Amino acid sequence: MKYELDKTSGNARRGRLVFERPQGTFSVETPAFMPVGTYGTVKGMTPEEVRATGAEILLGNTFHLWLRPGQEIMRKHGDLHDFMQWHRPILTDSGGFQVFSLGKLRKITEEGVKFQNPINGERIFLSPEKSMEIQYDLGSDIVMIFDECTPYPATFDYAKKSMEMSLRWAKRSRDRFDELGNKNALFGIIQGGVFEELRKVSLEGLVNIGFDGYAVGGLAVGEPKEDMHRILEYICPQIPADKPRYLMGVGKPEDLVEGVRRGIDMFDCVMPTRNARNGHLFVTDGIVKIRNAKYRDDTSPLDPECDCYTCKNYTKAYLYHLDKCGEILGARLNTIHNLRYYQRLMAEIRQAIEDDRFDDFVVEFYARMGKPVPPLQLADKS
């Protein structure tokens, strides 16, 4: 993988990731949003439908795919691309976030994490080395290091110890990745909670090890938005400019805009797909809660400005009807729309950066939703 930076507008960056795969060369235009395919599928969607929304890269979940179907079945198919029939780039997380979400079911040691398999109850062990081996079998185009996702709230001392262990695990991840002869990309993950000085130490340690890209982890875990913005404003300018920057697990449309304002290139989140299944649909001027009875006889399209299959063919009343009846098609049509909304948003962001009018775009984006523009806490790097 290589990263090409074309243009900046303030801190916002326009570029692309370029991947050489057996099927040819694939580009992922950045800033990019990655739909989440936890179990090797974006819920309810075929790969062709996901691609039709504009998605160029997907996220797969190492932890869940390790438990089911497992490495052996994955190897029998070739890799995750062959298993799910998506032959474009795939990024896989390391499994760290899911393991640490298990709470009392897991025990962290220097070696790794022992935990109870949530499927069958057996005790299993995940380490940096094991995570690299699983992701190698998945054929991930972008592999994430195994780290501890520092929870919120966390004291300075806890965040420091957690970050330092994540750095040691980063080196072990790098070493095992290289031993496997993996020719794909490996990203480091910056930790340190809401403490700027810890984030700086984490980044410096990762840069010394050397990675193909740098993710900001441990945000969107319950901290106030102001803290997330502050950490991004502080750390992004210090990340090597020739490497992509990935904000993990984020987020709402506003979060994507705010991330780009602060220099982020890549995002992933379950929000567009999960919200779609719950009847929360993103539109140009906010959110449509399709379960609201006022849409029962509404013959207008979901979003007149949207070019997705759902908006071109169906009314709000039909989507309301499908949801009310619990029809699977309702969830599918909602998902198509929400994923397309996110990809349209990213395309608009990329165009605004190209045209050097990203600041104007931000103002217009919030004006459409009737919201004020959140302030930047640090001065723009122009």
Curated annotation (Swiss-Prot):
* Gene Ontology molecular function: metal ion binding; tRNA-guanosine(34) queuine transglycosylase activity
Keyword Glycosyltransferase carried by entry: yes
- Domain of life from the UniProt record: Bacteria
Which InterPro entries does this one have?
ArchSynthase1/Queuine_TRR, TGT, TGT-like_sf, tRNA_ribo_trans-like
Presence of the UniProt keyword rRNA-binding in the record: no
**Active-site positions on this chain:** 93, 268
**Which terms under GO biological process does the entry name?**
queuosine biosynthetic process; tRNA wobble guanine modification; tRNA-guanine transglycosylation
Residues that bind substrate, according to the entry? 93-97, 147, 191, 218
Which protein is depicted? Queuine tRNA-ribosyltransferase
Give the originating organism: Haemophilus influenzae (strain PittEE)
Classification from the root reads: Bacteria, Pseudomonadati, Pseudomonadota, Gammaproteobacteria, Pasteurellales
